Design a protein with these regions (language model features):
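Function-dense linear segments that define catalytic or interfacial modules
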Residues: 2-99, 167
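Short linear motifs in exposed loops
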Residues: 148-149
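Catalytic or ion-translocation cores adjacent to nucleophile or general acid/base/metal-coordination motifs
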Residues: 152-180
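Active-site-proximal structural scaffolding
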Residues: 27-30, 54, 85, 113-117, ...
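Short, flexible loop/turn elements at secondary-structure junctions
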Residues: 36-41, 138-140, 152
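Internal maturation/activation junctions in enzymes
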Residues: 66-76, 91, 96-141
Length: 180
């Protein structure tokens, strides 16, 4: 509850939980709406802000899709009330500017990027005639996406040329049956 109320945009009295990966604080019967920004080695503060702007626009538009056929009304109600975004960065330690920031300068840069995302969300929410999002940015591990785009995972450095990954599949899935 304390973390959810940190920026004053979410109700502090709700008994929040998380999504399965525990990076997003959710009400009961609520969805994530994640958008990932891939940080490249040559990104600057300006290019990151541009990428975050696009991810925030995408997430804000996606937050309008709230007609969930087959689910109870509470799912739509929670989604419409909070319009959560989850704009995150992956590959942070592939970028010298971010990796070499000090404990004082990195929070300032990340705070500036977050403020930019909040401002973009407010602008687009006004244009779309919806309420601004209650939460906009997140930090998440991003293991799968980082592999697909050849980036360090989330906020973590690259440790090895090879990784062991756990993959779960339904035992009735044709691919699982083929591999076993």
């Amino acid at each position: 509850q304390r973390q959810a109320a940190k920026y004053g945009r979410r109700e502090s009295e709700i008994d929040y939980g998380t999504n399965p990966c525990s990076e997003i604080i959710l009400r009961p019967k609520q969805f994530c709406n994640l958008s990932e920004v891939v940080v490249r080695a040559d990104d600057t503060a300006e290019s990151l802000q541009d990428k975050i702007e696009l991810a925030t626009i995408l997430g804000t538009i996606q937050s309008c899709f709230t007609d969930f056929k087959g689910l109870g009304r509470q799912w739509s109600k929670n989604t419409e009330e909070e319009r959560l975004l989850g704009v995150s960065l992956t590959g942070i330690l592939d970028n010298a500017m971010l990796a070499n920031k000090t404990k004082d300068s990195l929070p300032a840069l990340l705070g500036s990027l977050r403020t930019g995302a909040v401002n973009v969300n407010r602008k687009w929410a006004t244009m779309l005639n919806i309420e601004p999002s209650a939460a906009i940015t997140c930090v998440k591990p991003s293991g799968t996406v980082s592999q697909l785009v050849d980036a360090a995972s989330g906020i973590h450095p690259r440790h090895s040329e090879y990784y062991i990954r756990t993959v779960r599949a339904d035992k009735k899935d044709p691919l699982t049956l083929f591999m076993t």
